[in-house]
């Protein structure tokens, strides 16, 4: 299978549309379809912070329902799911923008979005193993010895990265650079931590180029191993592009 794997969108629907068109997709009935049968894949964090989270969610739901996309959840997806479950989550760190959009919708739309997003999340794999094990898509990455496993430890790593429990002065978590130690044969494609350019290291690539923070929205074309990006229309926030610890 041939894939176009898209980094963290975070509600940047305009850039998502531009990127899919640049990749050769044609929008039909509100979803991007590739004339050559390429399939989209998403590293998670569809919503929060950006201006059009519901449109991004709607599009991905439609694509997955039509078996035209692969979706794995990110930590923001996990939090939105818990919000929809009625759990006591803090409506902060970007979730407030998605909740505000959702609350402005009519009751029928609210029910549909909530129900369909919860189904999307519940049916999604924690991480995706594709192309006979040659490709792994995991939101914040995955250790080689975790591939094929599924437990709370693996879930925490896949959603949040290799966090130490410590915090930076701005409140963001300290993360170890797990990719430095990866020695596996599978290509791991991930996002979560914004980088200015796609970051290749030891058969891994981080394609979260910080669209919602004014960077770019990036896709990896697989198996071609080419990255394609479009510039963000959001204000640039330099401090969000932090090197790994």
Swiss-Prot record:
One of its GO terms (cellular component) is cytoplasm. Its EC number is 3.6.1.17. This is Bis(5'-nucleosyl)-tetraphosphatase PrpE [asymmetrical]. It catalyses: P(1),P(4)-bis(5'-guanosyl) tetraphosphate + H2O = GMP + GTP + 2 H(+). Keywords: Hydrolase, Nickel. It comes from Anoxybacillus flavithermus (strain DSM 21510 / WK1). One of its GO terms (molecular function) is bis(5'-nucleosyl)-tetraphosphatase (asymmetrical) activity. It holds the Pfam family Metallophos. The keyword Lipid metabolism does not apply. Belongs to the PrpE family. Asymmetrically hydrolyzes Ap4p to yield AMP and ATP. Its cofactor is Ni(2+). Coiled coil: none annotated.
């Amino acid at each position: 299978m041939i894939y176009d794997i898209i980094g963290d969108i975070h509600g940047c629907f305009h850039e998502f549309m531009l990127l899919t068109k640049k990749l050769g997709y044609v929008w039909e009935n509100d979803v991007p379809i590739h004339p050559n049968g390429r399939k989209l894949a998403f590293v998670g964090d569809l919503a929060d912070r950006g201006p059009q989270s519901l449109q991004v969610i709607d599009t991905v739901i439609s694509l997955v329902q039509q078996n035209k996309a692969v979706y794995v959840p990110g930590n923001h997806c996990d939090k939105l799911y818990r919000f929809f479950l009625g759990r006591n989550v803090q409506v902060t760190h970007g979730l407030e923008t998605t909740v505000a959009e959702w609350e402005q919708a009519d009751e029928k739309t609210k029910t549909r979005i909530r129900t369909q997003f919860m189904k999307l999340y519940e049916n999604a794999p924690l991480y995706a193993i594709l192309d006979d094990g040659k490709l792994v898509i995991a939101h914040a990455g995955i250790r080689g010895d975790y591939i094929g496993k599924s437990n709370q430890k693996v879930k925490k790593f896949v959603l949040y990265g290799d966090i130490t429990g410590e915090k930076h002065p701005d409140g963001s978590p300290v993360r170890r650079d797990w990719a430095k130690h990866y020695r596996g044969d599978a290509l791991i494609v991930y996002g979560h931590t914004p980088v200015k350019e796609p970051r290749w290291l030891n058969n891994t690539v981080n394609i979260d180029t910080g669209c919602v923070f004014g960077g770019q929205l990036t896709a990896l074309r697989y198996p071609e191993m080419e990255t394609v990006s479009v510039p963000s229309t959001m204000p640039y926030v330099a401090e969000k592009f932090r090197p790994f610890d």
